[in-house]
Amino acid sequence: MKKQRLEGIGKEIMRVISKVLLEEVKNPKIKGLVSVTEVDVTEDLKFADTYFSILPPLKSDEKKYDHEEILEALNEIKGFLRKRVAEEVDIRYTPEIRVKLDNSMENAIKITKLLNDLKV
């Protein structure tokens, strides 16, 4: 399958999952704390590697969120997410959602903090 088509399917899956996380998921471990950063669909359309970013705490004194707990909660709802993708995206076979954490936001915050510390 052409790379452009796979990217289009990935973007569509990302749109649906983002919408579901925002509007339908009620789990407090996930709601408002997680965003979808990327979806990579395999060439055979069997899997959609979905990368989730965990938003950092708003205040610096708040404790960090437990990534393992959030990852577990996401894995619990991946069947529901796949069902919603099947309902909204018009493809013959709906890929299995594979949950992966994207730590790029955390890494960017750490780098920014280090740079700010150097300026002081």
UniProtKB/Swiss-Prot annotation:
Role: One of several proteins that assist in the late maturation steps of the functional core of the 30S ribosomal subunit. Associates with free 30S ribosomal subunits (but not with 30S subunits that are part of 70S ribosomes or polysomes). Required for efficient processing of 16S rRNA. May interact with the 5'-terminal helix region of 16S rRNA.
GO MF entries: ribosomal small subunit binding
Biological process annotations from GO: maturation of SSU-rRNA; ribosome biogenesis
Chief place of localization: cytoplasm
Subcellular locations according to the entry: Cytoplasm
InterPro entries: KH_dom-like_a/b, RbfA, RbfA_dom_sf
Gene3D superfamilies (UniProt xref): 3.30.300.20
Organism listed in the record: Fusobacterium nucleatum subsp. nucleatum (strain ATCC 25586 / DSM 15643 / BCRC 10681 / CIP 101130 / JCM 8532 / KCTC 2640 / LMG 13131 / VPI 4355)
Superkingdom of the source species: Bacteria
Assembly, per entry: Monomer. Binds 30S ribosomal subunits, but not 50S ribosomal subunits or 70S ribosomes.
Keywords recorded for this protein, A-Z: Cytoplasm, Ribosome biogenesis
Coiled-coil annotated spans: none
GO cellular component: cytosol
NCBIfam families cross-referenced by the UniProt entry: rbfA (TIGR00082)
Name this protein carries in UniProt: Ribosome-binding factor A
Gene: rbfA
Similarity comment: family membership: Belongs to the RbfA family.
Transmembrane feature ranges: none
